[in-house]
Amino acid sequence: MYYRTRLNEKIWKEIISILKICTILFAALVVTDTCSAQADVAPWGNITGVRIDGQLFPLQSSLGIARNNWTQISATAHERQRPKYNREGDKQIITTRIDSITFKEVVEDIGSGTIKVDIRSSSTAREALDAAFFRLTLSPKDYNLILVKSLKDRVLKSSIAKLPADFSTEANSIELTSAYSKATLTFPGSTTVIIKKDNNSNDSLYYIYIPLIEGTVTAATSTQKTFTISASGIIDHSPATFKLNTSIQGRPFDGFGGNFRLQNPKADPQVIDYCLNNMKVAWARVELPWRFWQPQLGEDPLLAAQNSKLNPRVQQAMEMAARLQHMNIPIILSAWFPPQWAVMGQLDMQPVNGIWGNPLDRGNATEIYKSITDYIIYLKNNYHATVSFFSFNESDLGINVRQTGAEHNMLIKGLGAYFKSHGLSTKMLLGDNSDATSYRFIYPAMNDPEAMQYIGAVSFHSWRGWDKATLEKWDSAATVLHKPLIVAEGSIDAAAWNYPAIFEEPSYALQEINLYVRLLSICQPLTILQWQLTSDYSPLAGAGIFGNNDTLHPTQRFWNFKQLASTPRGLFAMPVSQERTDISSAALGDNRKGIYTIHIVNNGASRNAVITGLPSKVSSLNIYVTGKNRSMKKGTPVRVVNGKARFHLDAATFTTLVSNK
């Protein structure tokens, strides 16, 4: 009997072990948010890496041309050309042009960590070139060893740091290796490989050039080159640990919001309706169509409005504000295009000699103040919409009123005082800058005590300047002034309207929400306003938007926004620390209410995670996940034991944890 019992125990242990293995295998078969391999390609043509099971194996490629004995290089980069981008199944297709050379690049995922690159190059004019090329940037931070091979034998084997400054050979493959990864370029035949050191860099950078065209080109010149890039290495599934500190409460976060600047009467309404009906919108920004409100200096816009002569653009903008106000959404009013009488010089909507916008005509300052104030008063009295803050959009850059920092300070004091004298509670936005990088623009007003009473909030747009040091400038400004911080235009690529197919790419969605989580953590904003919740930069696809004729439907970006927007209103920023560079996190909470939310973007492979520091009254966390194949999917609640919660982070996903008492 004893023997049989021990035997049964042994059998049961084996059965349990088999069941565990089956469970693991089943979990591996469950649909995840990444494919086995996928190229990360910027819409201007640069390959940034290959993702395998969510982990990015980095590359830095570009296309370009070389002149004057390789001393003059022009290469593809963000906002340097006007590329076109689209996807056809597993193929990403980019068409771009540098001077007379047109490139058509097709990057195709072909499985097993391998992508195929096909580049067709052609010329529209006769020109002497050293080469049109495909280029890889080599950094010791990514790879430390290079092996260039020919069919017969290796040609070059060297550490990246000790490469010759100028080297050329014929080769069939190039291998780049590091301690954890390898990337291999394989050519169907022998091809020229040129390696050159970047003498202008302090980071020991080298370039590998693969010529596509060499020598003088004519209008009839056309070439094609095809090769593969394979990536492999160790997939990092190591766990992540988050440490929450609830003893520090920073600035409040009202929630996620959006811009509602109307530009497309046909496509905008359906997107606006869907967003407002299906997502919690905490703040909104609308347009003052100033040039249509008062086109001429001598006109009385109030009289015209009272005589039913309100311009349709103005009426639509006011109706938009009224709709938002009816939903108890606070409003920011911004002006883009001024009327001619309000500015100096000939009004031009495009840059002149590289300079955008026109300065305000100081001689008409009183008339300018009155015109804007009349609009706000009319909006309040006739549409029952109250404007919380006013700004000129991106006046640091000139889109389309251009100001210096000193002029911006004068406007804040002058227009702010005019608002106050007419009984308005409307305050001025300090900044509303085009990018985080132009923070010096706000310094004159920051250092002027007289301006303080008229400033309602500090504001910038998130198109550029994402490094921590730059973002901390804005956090510091809000802290010093004791004012809220607003990201009045949130997104990541101001040129994306040129290649809108990128909006449906998981890589774009992940990069965008990653920035927002970093903004929450570093800047502690009152709100982030998506550019936009209309058909411009639409978070929806279909119904003819950007040429997509599918049924109207939300994209991954919409679900990212909805998940972020579901943060309980009015929570305070709280520190949450973790050491991984491929993860971003932000925490919000209210100790009095006992409510806590943690947002996490995992830019890498799947991994287990643990969070510590949760208050004892928190017994569980609701968990939501958005990724390529999941749309704010609610998972099994996560138990909290002794302030600690263990959960799983899926690859390349946005995860939100919300406390339950």
Language-model regions: role of each:
Residues R120-V193, V618, T626-K628, M632:
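Polysaccharide-binding surfaces and accessory modules of carbohydrate-active proteins
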Residues Q38-R97, L262:
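Acidic-aromatic substrate-binding/catalytic surfaces of carbohydrate-active enzymes
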Residues S62, A66, S74, N86-D90, ...:
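Beta-strand-rich recognition/accessory modules
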Residues S577-S619, A652:
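Carbohydrate-binding surface patches
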Residues P484-Q563, P568, P575-E579:
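Aromatic/acidic polysaccharide-binding cleft in carbohydrate-active enzymes
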Residues T221-K225, S232, P637-K661:
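C-terminal beta-strand-rich structural cap/linker in extracellular carbohydrate-active enzymes
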Residues L244-N245, M279-M446:
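Substrate-binding cleft and catalytic face of glycoside hydrolase catalytic domains
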Residues I377, R402-L515, I522:
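Noncatalytic carbohydrate-binding groove/subsite architecture in carbohydrate-active enzymes
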